[in-house]
Regions:
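N-terminal Rossmann-like NAD(P)+-binding domain of SDR-like oxidoreductases, especially those catalyzing
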Residues: 25-222, 352-356, 362, 366-379
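NAD(P)-dependent short-chain dehydrogenase/reductase
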Residues: 78, 163-179, 191, 201-273, ...
Length: 379
């Protein structure tokens, strides 16, 4: 029987159980560590709020404290309907040592999602990325160290840089070194990815130097409900819904390894409860697609011509290809992705943004105006 991954009844997405979309419930093995009081940083953002909903729906004995600064990418509405006895929201900065100390004293685990994550924003102003991604992570680690509590750090595959396209590789993307693994050397290429790499490294150092009970996960590109409309998939969907032509960087050959955010949630839970301290696990669902392919699929699903988009100037230092090898997570912890049909997941995501225009419409004009400062339509 498939697990109940339902979100809130209004303003939330209930994933389809259509054939080929969701597999059977994942097996996490026999020995799991139970946590009763967890802090989820960034739990009002896209990936973090989906994790909070996952815990709320699947682990009724767990109390969640969401610590979120509620910047433009955090939204109280993402968790509004589950706030109560089991989920509380604390509005604050993860770099506020006094606040973090107060919360950590009552917790037995921290799941650290909070991050500044938009590459374009990091190129315009790197300072918030240093503050949140590095100083914030340090502050949380010190609290975990003080109270000897479990710490899981949620990171990105972008810390590894990028890979050549499959057609340019001897193993066509499946050979040794042709996907990211936990052994891949760090090679970040943007202010965003460099601050995430730095935060990964201090987690590793705090494990080795101070015995902090920490793990790290590096995940590929997420999609699903609650993603801010500055991001690639929701931006294209909301452009079409707003009568604006979608925008494609350059030739659109850049490849991303897509994973549904609910699969990310189950992966993080598996690592939190069963992962080996000090280990890094990569979370991916074998979802490699180039940006042009994804955009054309969105256009097709929304009844538009496949060429009804504008090409714009490419992002500086735009990484070419990401690809995750999640063998370690699958074999060691028994995790498997449930959303294996990208088209079905994309259809559900399109439906969510179509049905919840009140969630994103107020921000649409400002988001496009911000992009217009740096993007020029190519002829």
């Amino acid at each position: 029987m498939a697990p109940d991954l339902a979100m809130k009844p209004k303003g939330c997405w209930r994933p389809s159980l259509a054939k080929g979309t969701i597999k059977k419930k994942i097996f996490l093995g026999e020995k799991m560590t139970e946590y009763k009081n967890i802090i989820v940083t960034g739990g009002a953002g896209f990936i973090g709020s989906n994790f909070v909903h996952y815990v709320y729906n699947n682990h009724p004995d767990v109390h969640v404290t969401v610590l979120d600064k509620l910047t433009y990418a955090g939204n109280r509405a993402n968790i509004e309907e589950i706030l109560g006895d089991r989920v509380e929201l604390v509005v604050g900065d993860i770099a506020d040592a006094e606040l973090v100390d107060k919360l950590a004293a009552k917790a037995d685990a921290i799941v650290h999602y909070a991050a500044e994550s938009h590459n374009d924003n990091s190129l315009n102003d790197p300072s918030p990325f240093i503050h949140t991604n590095f100083i914030g992570t340090y502050t949380l680690l010190e609290a975990a160290r003080k109270y000897d509590i479990r710490f899981h750090h949620v990171s990105t595959d972008e810390v590894y840089g990028d890979l050549p396209l499959r057609e340019d590789l001897p193993g066509h993307g499946e050979g040794p070194g042709e996907k990211f693994t936990a052994e891949t050397k760090y090679n970040p290429s943007s202010p965003y990815s460099s601050t995430k790499a730095a935060s990964d490294l201090i987690v590793k150092a705090w494990v080795r130097s101070f015995g902090v009970k920490a793990t790290i996960s590096n995940c590929s590109n997420n999609y699903g409900p609650y993603q801010h409309i500055e991001k690639f998939i929701p931006r294209q969907i909301t452009n079409i819904l707003s009568g604006i032509k979608p925008k494609l960087y350059g030739e659109g050959k850049n490849v991303r390894d897509w994973i549904h955010t609910n699969d990310h949630s189950t992966g993080v839970w598996a690592i939190l409860t069963k992962g080996r301290i000090g280990e890094t696990y990569l979370i991916g669902a074998d979802g490699e697609k180039n940006n042009k392919e994804v955009l054309e699929l969105i256009l097709e699903k929304m009844g538009q011509p496949k060429d009804a988009y504008d090409r714009v100037t490419d992002r500086a230092g735009h990484d070419l290809r990401y690809a995750i090898d999640s063998t370690k997570l699958r074999e060691e912890l028994g995790w498997e992705p449930q959303f294996t049909n990208f088209e079905s997941g994309l259809e559900e995501t399109i439906k969510w943004y179509t049905d919840h225009q009140d969630w994103w419409k107020a921000e649409k004009e400002a988001v496009e105006a911000n992009y217009a400062k740096t993007q020029e339509v190519l002829k």
